Amino acid sequence: MYEHNFNNVIKKLDMAGHTLQMDGNVTGIKMAQRALKECRPGGKALIFQRKIPIILNLFASETRIEVAMKGPVSKFNPDKELHDLQFMSPDKYKDINLSDLPILPHHEGDVSGSINTGCVISMADGIHNCGMYRIQPLSDSEAIIHCYPESGLACQLEKGEDIPVTVAVGTSFQLILTAVSKLPADADELKIADSITAKGLKYIKTDRYPVPYGTQIIIHGVVSATEKRTEGPFLIHTGEYSKPEDYPLLKIESVKMIENGYYHALVTGTDYCESRTLLEAAEKFTSGLRAE
């Protein structure tokens, strides 16, 4: 059994008493309120049962991160020599629509729900780039991608060309960690995620770019270099709402979901929460890089 499979990580956490099964027949705002209350020492990851289960607080504690990483983040540094990606045959996926996903608003002032754990993979000069950007759905065929100035994706868009992307939602923590970390512009994040995985991270081939084996949702699309739409507002980590601003249009080409998959989302807040835990883990990780 491949232990870094997203579902297997959840099973390990469940067996260790780190998860709670919840009634999913509530609003996203109620889910978020419960998730924020659970962000405390001894708090659990919450799995809200519905047609597509929603999992919150998955990586909202160092203990759960260590289960996913098989050790503390601080001990993992990329190898000086990165290796070619290793591939496995994929599990079964089915085609779905973006609107089939339970993308729910978490706060009263949110303009809508958003995909906020998506690892957005692109390629430049033969190198895989990966960043985590908020994605606001507009329809089954269009969304807005919050690629903030100076982000890897924004820098690629400066060339004036549309950018094909693959978005991995519900994926390996190693890729999530590299996606939220500040790494050199020429870093191949897929290879770095592999290098910090015990026995290596396994990938699957898709219609575009590779994603980790066991990724729950795979979205293919194209980020427009010319078309923008107004994104937001959303509650951000400062406790304030983002100002509505124009960001690039993401044209959706396909959405696939693994059989019996989960929808992984995180809740943003001013107190201790999953987004803060991820940023702290990224800081420890990049501190290790600087120390090499």
List where the protein language model places each region.
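Non-catalytic, beta-rich accessory domains that mediate macromolecular interactions or localization
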Residues: 1-292
